[in-house]
Amino acid sequence: MHNDPTDTAFLHQAIELAVQNAAAGQLPFGALIVRDGEVLGMGVNRELDEHDPTAHAEVDAIRNACRALSTRDLTGAVLVSSCEPCALCHVTAAVAGISRVVYAAPKELAMAILGPGDDGSNLLTDMQQALRALVPGQVEHVPTDGDGRPFERFAERGRP
């Protein structure tokens, strides 16, 4: 694994998207799709607004990048997420050709602040572990200052 010096700057952007989403009463997750130092797409978790369990921030960012570029192929791009992506997001990134994923907050931090989810998160965690075994080194945790801010903001507002 390697840590690109620009990872931290983009991770801070993803964290800020997540903080803004939490302040708006939505789930506290944000993501970017980046290639060659350019942001191709941004996304936030829209599950509550859209009543859609697949509307994760990472999937939203991938959809927006694909739409902006009129393609389904994001080869060479990096998924930058405010929090450790679940299996759904990992698979979506792989299908889009994204070869590298970096994230700020580990899922354990999110669960410590938000509590365990009621959304099948155990299933997603099991699937996540299986995926990582298939493609070792693709997903990288980059410790980032402020990675807990989105969850703290969400907890301050209370669950919707």
Regions found by a protein language model. Name each.
Residues 47, 81, 105:
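Residues that line or immediately flank small-molecule/substrate-binding pockets and catalytic motifs
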Residues 23-26:
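A short helix-loop-beta-strand connector motif used in the catalytic cores of GNAT acetyltransferases and
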Residues 1-21, 91-160:
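Zinc-dependent deaminase
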Residues 29-37:
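Short beta-strand scaffold segments in enzyme catalytic cores
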Residues 46-59:
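A short, polar/charged loop-to-alpha-helix boundary motif
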Residues 14, 18-21, 31, 57, ...:
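Small-residue (primarily alanine) positions within well-ordered alpha-helices
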Residues 63-96, 100:
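Helix-adjacent hinge/juxtasegments
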